[in-house]
């Protein structure tokens, strides 16, 4: 029995805008391979968004109105007309739209990134290019909101992950390029008397856990932004309990390129012994397609990294025999295997000790101990080599370790929130779990709802799941480990409709939060849980109460929620998601009420299934 608690006396957020999602307005757009939704499919997809009462849809948007052949703007061309239909469907469904006015900074302004040639670009003239971009931002308000009445467009997202190198920079830092473009857009809107028609959101920093650019933006762009935002993803699965020793952490990796390391000093011409405890599991046996796990002492070139500085692969060994490539099929997936190597440091006075996860198929690796010792000496040179102080002292990249992912989501969002100017809203503008790219897996619903509950509890004004549906990017044929399959970005809770009308299990979990937790004006009250069992409470402007409980583990759990303030005998309708009994079908209906808890006062007791999500609400179906 778990004891949960909700502080329903003082809200952590008094104006929650809802659990939204990235949902691009691609439905019906032309495609060079004919992968185009029919009108019926366009309607089905939009109706699903409306049925779940999706609060915010953030969409890709570019200079589709530009006619490159005539060098003129045509706001009624084929693509814009199709996009208007999507916007109208969103408006009819009560969905607020956030337009990404520019995706790549500065590449969309100076034509130096994957979106190609931009109509804003004046070769060699950043200032004029930037102004042309800003004029387009303002014209978008005139054409879409004022002239055509799409008043559900309420937010402009100022680029995507602009801290990255998304283009060739005009002798400026990524931060400066983004800030100058955002300032230009703000000033153009002010100039045209349109600033009150739209909110500017940024910087959309990601995928980082530190929100360093958000911190910078709060100090350098606060006069331009209405909503602050940043994000990250859960790259690593929660560590199974069988790997964990009480009082210590285990670091895990599941994406090729994941690694952790630290720089240490060496004595020249000294014999060393390096060892690592590893557990790993993969889905393939052929070493040529599986890849390897690299461990050892790598050259210190000033980067504090075990990844090569050029291309892909491990860095250079610091000495002969100082690194090893490990076939993951040769070590156990059930317990840790110790891998040891010996080397002489030669002329080296330092090295980078660490592990590089280069498993190319689906798989994982876990580590609970790294040691580097002089031969005959029992002192571990690696700082915090047993992870008793979590990962302090280690540089990590797509490598982490947690038993309860809720704690990570909460910490990541709090990190961003601490930098947001007082009284200003913060949106966690992308999230999902990426350690398993197949979103049909039974635990995905609980995993994303676990994140949503954490983001609500820490005080975010809104959050955006990447993405609500799988989506075919027009004229795109990308295949990569970021879930693109021939341009079909498979990140959603339902496949593209020309693959299947049947959604994933996670659709039925997420739609409960989306439908029964209201938007604008909703109050969020923080819940307190433990052992991967968490809760939160929302109260709508009209007084409707919704309590959410998520069990993000593989065991059934019983619980009692204690409310700090008596609920005064309300009746709560239960909506019960159990991935073991939920059967997805083409109807994609929201899970209805299966039980009513009558006269709820200061406690509520129930049982929740493994990876289950339960919503208790005063709302009627």
Place the predicted regions along the sequence by residue.
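Substrate-binding cleft and catalytic face of glycoside hydrolase catalytic domains
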Residues: 49-240, 270, 281-287, 347, ...
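Glycoside hydrolase catalytic-domain groove-lining segments
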Residues: 236-241, 398-435
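Mature N-terminal, pre-catalytic/accessory segment of carbohydrate-active enzymes
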Residues: 1-47, 52, 355
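C-terminal beta-strand-rich structural cap/linker in extracellular carbohydrate-active enzymes
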Residues: 592-621
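Carbohydrate-binding surface patches
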Residues: 529-570, 575, 611-617
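Extracellular and organelle-lumenal recognition/adhesion modules and their flexible linkers in secreted
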Residues: 238-407, 595
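Conserved, mostly hydrophobic/aromatic
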Residues: 21, 140, 156, 228, ...
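Aromatic/acidic polysaccharide-binding cleft in carbohydrate-active enzymes
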Residues: 428-534
